[in-house]
Amino acid sequence: MKNSSIVLASASPRRSELLESAGIQFRVVPADINEEPFPGEEPVDHVQRLAEGKARAAAELAEGRFFLGADTIVLCDGEIMGKPKDAADAKRMLNKLSGVPHEVVTGFAIYDRERKGAVVEAIRTKVFFKKLRDEEILDYIATGCPFDKAGAYAIQGGAAHMVQKIEGSYTNVVGLPLCEVVDALRVIGALGN
């Protein structure tokens, strides 16, 4: 798809792969912002704020017109799960997710430098994990896969066998709700017809 200078404000290879799979041309300019939640901040507000913050931060670093930022969290029993700090944190997260449904929430923002405004959305997907055995958790942690993933797992990788079902967008769980992002890019004029 043709574009008018789209910049992805993320170093995530998964987000890049998803955009590439849709035929979208873009450049990557990672934006580093503080990702700590504000006290009392609601999960949807949190991911939307971070997504827009990343998009606007990338606009300070690079040329272009449209800047796409995104942030994904896992929400389980009211806890916002970002990326685990270490193996013990990954084990704690996976134990908490074991056998219970949880939500993956991805906020995305497309900042339009020309119009000086942003489209900001959040998409929720419900994920159901099977009951995990301790050795499954430890084996998965040993792969190193959990450490750069919200909730300590990647549905598209080594954790696929842990997921019984999902309700909602699969690509949202991967890290970017592609259907909604492509629609938003089209609506704001970043893509051709």
Swiss-Prot record:
Its main location: cytoplasm. Gene3D superfamilies: 3.90.950.10. The keyword Zinc does not apply. GO terms for cellular component: cytoplasm. It is found in: Cytoplasm. The keyword NADP does not apply. The active site is at 71 (proton acceptor). InterPro entries: ITPase-like_fam, Maf-like. It comes from the Bacteria. Transmembrane segments: none annotated. Its EC number is 3.6.1.9. It holds the Pfam family Maf. Its cofactor is a divalent metal cation. It catalyses: dTTP + H2O = dTMP + diphosphate + H(+); UTP + H2O = UMP + diphosphate + H(+). Keywords: Cytoplasm, Hydrolase, Nucleotide metabolism. GO terms for biological process: nucleotide metabolic process. The record marks 14, 72, 156 as: Important for substrate specificity. NCBIfam families: maf, PRK14368.1. Nucleoside triphosphate pyrophosphatase that hydrolyzes dTTP and UTP. May have a dual role in cell division arrest and in preventing the incorporation of modified nucleotides into cellular nucleic acids. Belongs to the Maf family. YhdE subfamily. HAMAP family: Maf. This is dTTP/UTP pyrophosphatase.
